[in-house]
Amino acid sequence: MPKRRWIITGLVAGLLGLAIGATAVAAPSIAAIACPQCYGLSSLGEGVYAERDDDAYQRIVTTAEQRISGFYGERTSDARVLICATEECYQSIGGGGEKGQAFGRWALRLSPDGANETIATHELAHIELHKRLGSVYESVPDWFDEGLAVLISDDARYLDPANGGNRCRVPYEEAAPIVDADWATFGDAGSDRKYLLAACVVTHWVDEHGGAAGVLTMISDMRAGKKFSELQ
């Protein structure tokens, strides 16, 4: 009987090893989030893991977190952040052509081109919104999720300076159709114009709803069961 137990234990361990290996091959992003060190990323503290031991990465994340707190009044999320200094690293953890990517409410990765305060804030803004919304976060339209992230990150590629007045870089009438568009298929391949349009619409929405307080009310209402379309 003891021998049989050892055989079963060995089989279970082997199967677990195969499962972990299969996950690493099929879903490197998930595997890297679970074990950053397995992909050559070292801990810089505070949940930040980077390919290169550089204090600048920690400062980038700290500044991004402060921007999130500055908008909402406080930060509720606590994401694991993976930062790559080379394209080889970024590809190994499942990255593609994007500068960064958030994963639900738990983690984000930054490419070499995305390791800056703007992109880090953008991705953390997604995570903060998702964390605050809880299980209903997928009910928020992509255009709002992305446009709000652009606004919070104050991305100069898509918004005019915050010196009062209209921040849209296109006429609002030109931007408005993004609300009814399919975010995943909108625009030409490789174009980021949809972020420009979403930023314009969301900036107007936030202004019309009382700023960050309006976003907090929206979150509260959605958690209480209201649909986003009912909050317009």
At which residue positions do the language-model features occur?
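Acidic/His/Gly-enriched intrinsically disordered linker/tail segments
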Residues: I119, S135-Q232
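Short pre-active-site segment immediately N-terminal to the catalytic Zn-binding motif
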Residues: G104-T121, G134-V140
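Active-site-flanking alpha-helical
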Residues: A125-L133, S153
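Acidic/histidine-rich, surface-exposed loop or edge segments in extracytoplasmic proteins
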Residues: C38-D54, R105-W106
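Auxiliary, metal-adjacent structural segments of Zn-dependent hydrolase domains
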Residues: D53-G104, D113
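Hydrophobic membrane-insertion alpha-helices, especially the h-region
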Residues: I7-P28
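C-terminal region of N-terminal signal peptides and the immediate post-cleavage residues
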Residues: G21-L41
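N-terminal Lys/Arg-rich, disordered targeting/topogenic segments
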Residues: M1-R5
